[in-house]
Swiss-Prot record:
UniProt note on tissues of expression: Expressed in spleen. Detected on a number of myeloid cells including CD11b monocytes, CD66b+ neutrophils, at low levels on CD4+ and CD8+ T-cells, and in a subset of NK cells. Not detected on B cells (at protein level). Expressed at high levels in placenta, spleen, plasma blood leukocytes, and lung. Expressed at moderate levels in lymph node, bone marrow, fat, uterus, and trachea. Has low expression levels in other tissues.
Annotated SMART domains: IG
Cytoplasmic domain ranges by topology: 216-311
Protein name per its UniProtKB record: V-type immunoglobulin domain-containing suppressor of T-cell activation
Glycosylation sites: 49, 91, 128
Compartment(s) where it occurs, according to its Swiss-Prot or TrEMBL record: Cell membrane
Amino acid sequence: MGVPTALEAGSWRWGSLLFALFLAASLGPVAAFKVATPYSLYVCPEGQNVTLTCRLLGPVDKGHDVTFYKTWYRSSRGEVQTCSERRPIRNLTFQDLHLHHGGHQAANTSHDLAQRHGLESASDHHGNFSITMRNLTLLDSGLYCCLVVEIRHHHSEHRVHGAMELQVQTGKDAPSNCVVYPSSSQDSENITAAALATGACIVGILCLPLILLLVYKQRQAASNRRAQELVRMDSNIQGIENPGFEASPPAQGIPEAKVRHPLSYVAQRQPSESGRHLLSEPSTPLSPPGPGDVFFPSLDPVPDSPNFEVI
């Protein structure tokens, strides 16, 4: 029983090691860079212009084979994850508002797009990128998201996003200019923790079949070894003959044990080389008595008292 336990413990150690490696590989890009929002809430009066800003933080690879895809879209606050829904901004989708730039190139959207829809996207070399909205209306209120996708060799490697809310007010309670509220560190930590938890769950689900397969292989090997040990022990037991029992042919498939009768031994006199045995001679001291003889020798009578008269 000790061998299977050791094998199972080893399999679980290997499974934990594989899970840790996959988790580190999957969460490595999460810690590489992220998107920060300097302001989480913008409150602006109707008809005003506003610029929503996001900032790319962390080490960013500036190789020629790396491209960053940046864009904007509207969304709604979900119960599980923010920015999961992608809605257009003033009838422009996130494909229309995207920015492509490499490590040594900045990009701006065309001036015609800004004039037609009152929008303009911009980015710089310091990781800041923004979208400017002119002539705000009440319909512009809502949640806005910025998205950054890292593309290596024409394949998407990693994507991060940030969220902020825009409130357009009218009337006496509306401010004269836009008022911005900075983001709290707790919100950023919650977003990062949620991203890490989601990545860990996904990697765990992907690694679970591999871990189960490894455990199954180890248990199968342990079962085969146990079966071989049992067969070897059975062969050794069958090779030793029991002197008290003899296996008889089975009757109707049920083996029976046949009892051997104990061997009887009768002591007999073995003849000597001369053909006669000492005990067979009648005159020997240890020979059995003949017919009419007494085994013990007879003794002469002893007088009761000495004759004192004869001196």
